[in-house]
A protein has these predicted regions:
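Generic alpha-helical structural signal
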Residues: 12-15, 90, 94, 174-177, ...
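Amphipathic alpha-helical effector-binding/dimerization core
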Residues: 62-162
């Protein structure tokens, strides 16, 4: 690695703390962080005070434990690429929610997880949705299955590495790869929710002409059968896939350009 021409030790310590909390995924005490980074508790404490004041880390129910807040996520969403995705997706999400009487969500990959970056509530009194910033393993969601299935081979290999580092079992990763072939053939994923009984998750890939690693996001519907539902579960996947294709077209993507 090329040595940086300038050093900013305080900034480096702050970034190390953020990366540590993101990598460990479970709340950590100041002593835990100091031990992980090989630094003294006092220097970590000073940095944590600043990060907590700025809203980048927060206390859990256990006041001794710290975790990342959604602040980094919120800052990241201000960047132009993500705003372009939002601008293209939100009108289609709103229209799809009204047509299907279902909640709609938009998810992207984050290491070995998916993160929900946008959502539209169901116009119906009954629906299912998760909060913005919600994270879940790639292997435990339709969004994750879609994003894995429609990634390039190189990017899929990277996702598998991240899953292995996160403790995923080889048999589970083999099952994920087998399911990916079926999803690629269908053009969408449709599976019972692994979070809530009675919900069927339907997801379809969104592509961006400026992104080369495959699907940039998953348009996902946690489908709930209600008396007011305007679309049957059998017809829903086609509508979700069509909406995802329109969003992709808005982002300048066409199937011809797919590598």
């Amino acid at each position: 690695m090329t040595e940086a021409p300038y050093k900013a030790p305080a900034l480096e310590k702050g970034l190390d703390i953020l990366e540590c909390l993101a990598g460990l995924r479970t709340p950590q005490s100041i002593s835990d962080i100091a031990r992980s980074l090989g630094r003294s508790r006092s220097e970590i404490y000073r940095m944590v005070v600043v990060l907590e004041t700025r809203g980048y880390v927060e206390r859990t129910d256990d006041p001794e434990k710290l975790q990342l807040s959604n602040r980094l996520f919120e800052v990241g969403m201000r960047s132009p690429p993500k705003m372009d995705l939002h601008e293209a997706a939100l009108p289609e999400m709103s229209a799809l929610a009204s047509r299907m009487m279902q909640s709609i969500q938009l998810a992207v990959v984050s290491s070995d997880q998916i993160v929900v970056i946008a959502r539209t509530e169901s116009p119906d009194d009954v629906g299912f949705s998760v909060r913005l910033g919600h994270r879940r393993s790639i292997m435990k969601s339709a969004s994750g299955l879609v994003l894995f299935s429609f990634a390039t081979p190189v990017y899929r290999a990277k996702m598998l590495e991240d899953l292995a580092e996160g403790g995923a079992q080889p048999s589970d990763m083999e099952s994920l790869q087998a399911s990916a072939h079926q999803v690629q053939e269908a053009g969408y994923a449709c599976m019972p929710s692994r979070m809530v009984d009675g919900v069927t998750d339907i997801g379809a890939p969104i592509f961006d002409s400026t992104i080369s690693h495959g699907a940039v996001a998953s348009l996902t519907v946690p489908f709930v059968v209600t008396r007011r539902a305007k679309v049957s579960l059998q017809d829903a996947p086609g509508l979700v896939a069509e909406a995802a294709q329109r969003i992709s077209a808005t982002l300048g993507y066409s199937p011809v350009s797919k590598s």
